[in-house]
Amino acid sequence: MIWQEKIDAALDARRVADALRRRYPVAQGAGRWLVADDCQYLNFSSNDYLGLSHHPQIIRAWQQGADQFGVGSGGSGHVSGYSVAHQVLEEELAEWLGYSRALLFISGFAANQAVIAAMMAKEDRIVADRLSHASLLEAASLSPSPLRRFAHNDVTHLARLLASPCPGQQLVVTEGVFSMDGDSAPLEEIQQVTQQHDGWLMVDDAHGTGVIGEQGRGSCWLQKVKPELLVVTFGKGFGVSGAAVLCSNTVADYLLQFARHLIYSTSMPPAQAQALRASLAVIRSDEGDARREKLAALITRFRAGVQDLPFTLADSWSAIQPLIVGDNSRALQLAEKLRQQGCWVTAIRPPTVPAGTARLRLTLTAAHEMQDIDRLLEVLHGNG
């Protein structure tokens, strides 16, 4: 098979399965409204959970940072790309979440890949929740360490896997809030079992940080758990982009030596770090509390209104509210119907989710109003 035949066959297989991914250029897509092709939609696909992407204080901080530092960092943090703006942000993140150190990364995907690649060797073992994010599972599969997956949130299965002999170290990997189901991991139980087997715990809290817990400190803080490795990202609750790894001093020093994604990537712009500091200030403030309370009320309203729909409703009280349809083509049809009625919703299909669980991944944000939720419910019930 020549290259073109290989590529064509892969694309044809996706088309036949109604699993071909497409991008849609939008004029505005992060806030309450999405604008595409000169049409305006209520946006139920954004991860901007607190509605901070258009916050004037954060925008102003980015603009002032660009005036001070320029629009780029100019290099890796190991060369000339680590500014005082990066340093102060790392210190503020560490203090906020109760860790000795924080290290900034350009994305959550990069952070997860970097940590697992740097930490694991062939004599070690990775034990990951089966529904962990693609960045975690891909990093684990590329690692020299064997990968074992435990059934979703099944602590008994996790304990059984950890109990089998391992010549090296064991790293347990999970998410705080799962990106496709919106449910939460039982972190206290997972940490207890992990410690019983002398393992370390790595939690990706991309969808919890900023959104839940006291001052938005996330899933681990809420469940009174402190994993050895905590990954937080800034494209969801923070309304910006980027990520950080929270850890001990020695682990941070180790990652600075061996995390290749950190060493060989250009750092995020200092202006972005300034914007993230402003976002963190909002998240920790009374305004942040008010936004989280509003989001919780919207979630309650939505869940009360979808109980009688002919879809499987996930066990989620997070901003992620998937309606599991099952069939790929049915999910696509429903998403298109919603768009025709002015609600922008994304159909998520395999391989992003397991076969037979295609869904509408609805996300609610603090930028929404109660009437937006009521409109969505009206359309879902066929009364649009």
From Swiss-Prot:
Its EC number is 2.3.1.47. Pyridoxal 5'-phosphate binds at residues 108-109, 179, 207, 233. Keywords: Biotin biosynthesis, Pyridoxal phosphate, Transferase. Pathway: Cofactor biosynthesis; biotin biosynthesis. GO terms for molecular function: 8-amino-7-oxononanoate synthase activity; pyridoxal phosphate binding. The modification N6-(pyridoxal phosphate)lysine is found at residue 236. It catalyses: 6-carboxyhexanoyl-[ACP] + L-alanine + H(+) = (8S)-8-amino-7-oxononanoate + holo-[ACP] + CO2. GO terms for biological process: biotin biosynthetic process. Substrate binds at residues 21, 133, 352. The keyword Cell division does not apply. PROSITE patterns: AA_TRANSFER_CLASS_2. Its cofactor is pyridoxal 5'-phosphate. Homodimer. NCBIfam families: bioF (TIGR00858). Belongs to the class-II pyridoxal-phosphate-dependent aminotransferase family. BioF subfamily. Catalyzes the decarboxylative condensation of pimeloyl-[acyl-carrier protein] and L-alanine to produce 8-amino-7-oxononanoate (AON), [acyl-carrier protein], and carbon dioxide. This is 8-amino-7-oxononanoate synthase. It comes from Escherichia coli O6:H1 (strain CFT073 / ATCC 700928 / UPEC). The gene is bioF.
